[in-house]
């Protein structure tokens, strides 16, 4: 069973009689193991130690509140809400295996239930026939229309057709699934940049967003993935999948600190309903055990 960061902190307080340098060394290790990342962990602990000395802090909760104070600026929320009577395009990015296609379906159902008119899922991962089929199955189950071409087709043309369809119906939302073969990085980047140009042209002003899906259990790999996609096309928002507050989960802090990308949604399970609007305060409190 994985021990949460919050439990590790409680164990630290049980083991150490004083809030001293040895305590802060172990706090650094716990943050790194919690996927906050070494650089961010060292910076946070250095600042926390100085504040605790200055304020003469000796209680567990006070130390955690200092950490919360320091972490809060790095963890931000972005509201992704399509505008009525406008064409919105949300390009959903991520490596294979993070739950990207399922996340597209979860988001589509979320928007359908919240009253977004004319939502469409675009099967723009044309590299994998299985991805197209998977999205079509999700479409049948959620009642959300899917625009798809044959396997091997130009992904940008799929997004173009989906956006044209939405536009012809007076506006709505295109959620575009995309390829994630990071092992073939150069080809993938070129493909995404082409889709990016088309999506930007077809969406109404201010209605185009690039959303990166990351697996909350993959730690610093997720940060490296975010760096690649952010450099390629720019990322506006994160969806954190496979999130389990009892395990690691600190990667949103690392991405926020290093890249400044906010989080829109958090997914806690496989079901279509297992998606929620991200709440930074709840996330930080769960991470720290407050």
Q: What residues fall within each predicted segment?
A:
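Generic structural signal for short, flexible, solvent-exposed coil/loop and linker residues
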Residues: 2, 21, 25, 52, ...
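Primarily NTPase-proximal linker/entry elements flanking Walker-type ATP/GTP-binding cores
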Residues: 3-124, 131-167, 171-176
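Acidic active-site catalytic centers that drive phospho-/nucleotidyl reactions
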Residues: 35, 125, 177, 215, ...
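Short hydrophobic/aromatic residue motifs in ordered secondary structure
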Residues: 38-40, 128, 244, 272
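Short glycine/serine/threonine-rich phosphate/pyrophosphate-binding segments
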Residues: 100-105, 129-131, 221-223, 247-250
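Conserved catalytic-core segment of NTP-binding enzymes
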Residues: 155-168, 184-289
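Short glycine-rich anion-binding loops that position phosphate/pyrophosphate groups of nucleotides
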Residues: 179-181
């Amino acid at each position: 069973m994985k021990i949460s960061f919050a439990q590790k902190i409680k164990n630290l307080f049980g083991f150490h009689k004083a809030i001293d340098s040895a305590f802060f060394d172990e706090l650094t290790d716990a943050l790194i193991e919690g996927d906050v990342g070494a650089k961010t962990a060292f910076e946070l602990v250095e600042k926390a130690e100085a504040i605790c000395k200055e304020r003469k802090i000796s209680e567990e909760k006070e130390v955690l509140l200092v950490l919360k104070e320091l972490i809060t600026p790095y963890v931000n929320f972005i509201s992704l809400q399509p505008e009525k009577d406008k064409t919105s395009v949300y390009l959903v990015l991520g490596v294979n295996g993070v739950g990207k296609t399922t996340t597209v379906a979860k988001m589509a159902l979320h928007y359908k239930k919240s009253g977004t008119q004319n939502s469409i899922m675009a099967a723009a991962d044309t590299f994998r026939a299985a991805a197209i089929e998977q999205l079509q199955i999700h479409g049948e189950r959620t009642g959300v229309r899917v625009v798809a071409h044959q396997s091997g087709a130009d992904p940008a043309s799929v997004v173009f057709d989906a956006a044209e369809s939405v536009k012809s119906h007076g506006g709505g939302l295109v959620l575009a699934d995309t390829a994630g073969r990071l092992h073939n990085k150069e080809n993938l980047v070129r493909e995404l940049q082409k889709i990016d140009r088309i999506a930007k042209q077809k969406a109404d002003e201010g209605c185009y967003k690039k959303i990166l899906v990351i697996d909350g259990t993959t730690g610093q790999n997720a940060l490296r993935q975010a760096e690649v996609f952010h450099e390629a096309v720019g990322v506006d928002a994160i969806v954190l999948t496979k999130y389990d507050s009892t395990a690691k989960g600190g990667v949103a802090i690392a991405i926020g600190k290093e890249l400044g990308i906010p989080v829109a949604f958090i997914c806690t399970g496989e079901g279509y309903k297992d998606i929620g609007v991200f709440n930074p305060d709840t996330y930080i409190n769960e991470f720290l055990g407050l």
